[in-house]
Amino acid sequence: MPGILRAAGDVQRRNISAFRTHDWRDHFERLGKGIIIADTASMMLQHWTTEGEMRLYPTSVPLTDELTKRGYTEVVEKRKNPGWAPTPSMRERNPEWPAYVEGGDPTNPLGTRALYLSWTYYRIHGTQDTRKIGRKSSNGCIGLYNRQIEEVYDRAPIGTQVKLI
């Protein structure tokens, strides 16, 4: 059931889908080039443009808390149809995985777009496996449906501020 918002209340805000929503001002001083907040507990991502327009997306999140970072970062690179190589720790856990998968390959776990964060190996990306959205299923990244990462990709420039919570 959605919480009732009161000016001085301490009620968690929830939208009709039961995602907890955030006010960007609670986390950042200014919109800058835009803001992304990825909430691993509610498995959602909020994106604000420089104009303040906000959109909300369901996500996949890491399998365990140990597999991801929390805190502030930013988008430092964007790629269409990115290639994928497992990290050294992924290769250690899954030696049968390929060393590299070309962009556009239907087995590529990064989907059709990827936002590269300032943290090594961390991405916000699409997925070819739509069953992963709304689940703990990643090795550290935040995943979106391909059509939704394409939307975020088009709206979020390099320099977009990001917070993972």
Where are the regions that the model predicts?
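N-terminal twin-arginine translocation
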Residues: M1-R14
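Short, mixed charged/polar active-site loops
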Residues: E53-L56, R70
